[in-house]
């Protein structure tokens, strides 16, 4: 049994290469079955995200070159082009790498939690494809346990390190229960999409997406059960909004002090939490002067992100130690597992010899044999049969000068120099 982890990621390959090596969800089952069939891999799983494509494999004999060639052929790349960006981890290093990936230690955003869910999806697809067996299955379970321990025992996932997540985290500090809050998101780009996802996951009661074009606002809104409006509708929506987060490419402010003052009057001065992520700013700076407005800018969030990233980097050291222990423990249990088949066969052989001698003894007793004599004969016969094969092999090893094997046998049978009878001088 041998483990292999092979792939590319955001640190080793450009976006162009990562896009060309990525697997679509529809490709995965067929790709896994083909991978096992063409590379002599007994078990396999594929993790494919925007930042990485990795193959996790169990083989009788490691063959990284064959797997790399298959990956190049599958995606119609030259082997040299792929080899320039690929990395290979074997055995213990492969186990440790999987645990680091699942724990977010190898992610673009240190400690990000989404990767664990993606790893679990990779395992589920491999099970569907029938390419996960007992060994890779055990490795995945150990990997999930290690990642859970990292999350539980360290602070690596506690502090937000993206602007979008930081904005939502600040909102949670202002509003004890986001499930009772309404949010107005201005813009429909990547950052606002992330904000919408985080707010949706937090159970915000109602989300409104305002954008220059209704089409783009609607596309985003449909993903999270939100409502889409135009920028011109913002004044009407503002009065119902507890949270306002804006990120557009506008060169002029979209939200002014007068519109916010009017909304606050309608809200009877119920506070509004605002985050302006845009550069240039979408919200006039004077809005921050209003008593019932909590206005944060992108610079405020960057300070939070920088401090939190520093905190995560400190937690990463403890996480790395947990992963190292987890990998060592898994390899130890795997080595112990290798002896199970031998022990099972030896036990079956011993039980067969025992049954043979027992049947012989029962026949002697049935024929009137003396019980003490029968028991003595049973003991001698069983001892001789159990020792026969080891005795023959030990004599053979001794004749061949295999002193190392003899020493191992002495350890195996828990013998020492004083345990054997010596011939009289």
Curated annotation (Swiss-Prot):
Q: Name one GO biological process term.
A: protoporphyrinogen IX biosynthetic process from glutamate
Q: Which InterPro entries match?
A: 4pyrrol_synth_GluRdtase (IPR000343), 4pyrrol_synth_GluRdtase_dimer (IPR015896), 4pyrrol_synth_GluRdtase_N (IPR015895), GluRdtase_CS (IPR018214), GluRdtase_dimer_dom_sf (IPR036453), GluRdtase_N_sf (IPR036343), NAD(P)-bd_dom_sf (IPR036291), Shikm_DH/Glu-tRNA_Rdtase (IPR006151)
Select a single GO molecular function from the record's annotations and give it.
NADP binding
Q: Where does this protein hold NADP(+)?
A: 187-192
Listed EC numbers: 1.2.1.70
- Alphabetical UniProt keywords: NADP, Oxidoreductase, Porphyrin biosynthesis
CDD domains of this UniProt entry? Answer: NAD_bind_Glutamyl_tRNA_reduct
| More details | During catalysis, the active site Cys acts as a nucleophile attacking the alpha-carbonyl group of tRNA-bound glutamate with the formation of a thioester intermediate between enzyme and glutamate, and the concomitant release of tRNA(Glu). The thioester intermediate is finally reduced by direct hydride transfer from NADPH, to form the product GSA.
The similarity annotation says: Belongs to the glutamyl-tRNA reductase family.
Please state what the protein is called.
Answer: Glutamyl-tRNA reductase
